[in-house]
Regions:
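Bacterial N-terminal signal peptides that target proteins for export
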Residues: 2-15
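C-terminal motif of bacterial Sec signal peptides marking the signal peptidase cleavage site
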Residues: 23-27
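Post-signal peptide N-terminal segment of mature Sec-exported envelope proteins
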Residues: 35-56
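Stable alpha-helical elements in mature extracytoplasmic
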Residues: 38, 42, 59, 63, ...
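Short, compositionally biased low-complexity segments enriched in polar/charged residues
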Residues: 57-86, 100-104
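A short, solvent-exposed beta-edge/loop patch
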Residues: 83, 126-162
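A short acidic-to-branched-hydrophobic micro-motif
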Residues: 88-98
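Short Gly/Thr-rich strand-loop-strand
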Residues: 99-138
Length: 162
């Protein structure tokens, strides 16, 4: 009987160690830097954090018009702009095909920021303030840009996607 108990304890110890090893391997095999994440999935997180109903969703043509980005640079994106041209609100989450392209996309967005700054500086000071407080950042193959009163919440939702 004693030998049976000793064998049972060894078996239990082995199963416990096996569970720990499997758990460790599963925990270390997570996604790398959001590579499998889509712009739509990130947008869904942002929509849960802030209300985008008063903004218009943009298409590839609008993306090209605002940021001068070609289809060969962008793998996936979401774009929201203000419903009126007297508002500066914008939200863009752009997933580039290659992480090296993120910096050039960021430069194109900076040109858009400069153009909006000139447009709103004297015309609509409260909108100019929002442009000055914009959020522009990259994370892996993603470029995030937000001009809004709720830009901080949008940024937090973007960051939490990983």
């Amino acid at each position: 009987m004693k030998q049976y108990r000793q064998g049972a304890w060894k078996c239990l110890a082995f199963l416990f160690m096996l569970a720990v090893v499997i758990g460790a391997l599963a925990g270390c095999s997570g996604k790398q830097d959001g590579e499998e994440l889509s712009a739509a999935a990130v947008a869904e997180r942002i929509q849960r954090a802030v209300n985008l109903d008063e903004m218009n969703q943009g298409d590839r043509k609008k993306l090209h018009k605002l940021y001068h980005l070609d289809a060969d640079e962008v793998e996936d994106f979401i774009l929201y702009t203000a419903a009126s041209n007297v508002k500066a609100d914008e939200l863009a989450v752009i997933k580039v095909k290659d992480a090296d392209q993120a910096e050039s996309v960021k430069q194109n967005i900076l040109q858009r920021i400069e153009a909006q700054t000139v447009k709103f500086k004297d015309y609509r000071p409260e909108e100019y303030f929002l442009i000055e407080k914009h959020v522009l950042k990259t994370k892996g193959r993603f470029v995030f840009f937000a001009v809004s009163k709720e830009a901080a919440q949008m940024e937090a939702a973007f960051d939490s996607a990983w």
